């Protein structure tokens, strides 16, 4: 069964027990931390992203034999030893800044893979899990079902699977919140964004206290090298860093509209503003030369992006926008596409 079939199976089984489709869709959206409309759109288009297969199998109560899926389906890629060491060094430095005694904590590596982080984390104080252990010190366990039965203090540390738009990484963070005081993860650069729908805005119980770009050298389980654009972030329950607080932006001078004009209503957004904006910017594209200002919506890569209206000093703002290096303002996703978010645009002005 594919993801679409599994979702339909769940709905049908719930209906057999007197639970309406609407109620089940609401429950699934909460479990997956998605908008209800997203689930409804999947059903309408009969196209559920394959990345949600494991999530839906768990909801359906299906047994998962991970050996039947390849490493890309499981979103597995391993951290380079020097990257693991750098992350731990950053962590120790930040814990000193916040006067945290790390000797009082146990560490949990939730997706240990080949065990690279076990070489840098305190061996006598680290628990390591993975759905497919590749190291003798790693226990076979689905971290998303793990809850310690004691009241000890925990730090969750590692490189979780990312999932589609970071959905798996978000699940790992939020599950950690049930027992841990800190989460220290390698994450997709999407977690740097504070735009609408950003996984950063859906993190529960934690405050972001540190975030920085790190090396992009990783490895698939078969040894193939891969470049992945990532951040290392530290999230805390009890500490805050004003530098990373999400702030409201002033749109009295600059107004940013998300624009798209697809074939169906679900693919259309703010179409009335198309042709009425002062400049246009891509929301995503490949190649830094394409992440630039456009005079027309029709010229945008994929004909999707942002329209910007300047409420005063139009000539000055347009000139300023043309001089901004939008490629450097954007962030790279794991597939090297450049992404721009509304918050980043407003910050640039």
Region locations from a protein language model:
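Class I S-adenosyl-L-methionine-dependent methyltransferase catalytic core
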Residues: 1-349
């Amino acid at each position: 069964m594919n993801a679409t079939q599994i979702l339909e199976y769940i709905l049908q089984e719930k209906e057999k027990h007197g639970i309406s489709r609407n109620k089940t869709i609401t429950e699934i959206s909460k479990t997956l931390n998605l908008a209800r409309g997203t689930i409804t759109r999947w059903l309408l288009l009969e196209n559920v992203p394959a990345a949600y297969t494991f999530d839906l199998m768990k909801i359906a109560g299906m047994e998962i034999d991970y050996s039947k899926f390849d490493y890309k389906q499981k979103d597995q890629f391993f951290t380079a030893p020097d990257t693991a060491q750098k992350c731990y060094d950053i962590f120790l430095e930040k814990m000193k800044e916040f006067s945290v005694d790390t000797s009082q904590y146990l560490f949990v590596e939730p997706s240990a893979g080949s065990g690279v982080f076990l070489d840098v984390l305190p061996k006598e104080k680290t628990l390591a899990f993975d759905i497919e252990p590749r190291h003798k010190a790693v226990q076979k366990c689905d971290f998303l079902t793990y809850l310690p039965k004691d009241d000890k203090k925990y730090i969750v540390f590692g490189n979780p699977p990312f999932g589609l738009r970071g959905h798996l990484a978000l699940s790992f963070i939020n599950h950690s919140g049930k027992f841990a005081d800190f989460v220290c993860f390698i994450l997709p650069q999407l977690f740097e964004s504070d735009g609408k729908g950003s996984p950063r805005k859906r993190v529960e119980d934690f405050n972001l206290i540190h975030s920085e770009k790190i090396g992009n050298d990783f490895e698939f389980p078969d040894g193939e090298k891969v470049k992945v654009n990532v951040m290392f972030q530290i999230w805390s329950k009890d500490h805050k860093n004003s530098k990373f607080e999400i702030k409201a932006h002033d749109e009295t001078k600059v107004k940013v509209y998300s624009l798209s004009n697809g074939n169906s209503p679900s693919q259309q957004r703010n179409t009335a503003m198309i042709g009425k904006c002062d400049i246009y910017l891509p929301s995503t594209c490949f190649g830094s030369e394409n992440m630039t200002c456009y005079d027309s919506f029709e010229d945008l890569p994929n004909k999707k992006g942002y329209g910007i209206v300047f409420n005063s000093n139009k000539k000055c703002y347009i000139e300023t926008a043309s001089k901004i290096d939008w490629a450097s303002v954007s962030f790279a996703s794991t597939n090297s596409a450049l992404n721009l978010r509304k918050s980043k645009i407003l910050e640039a002005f």
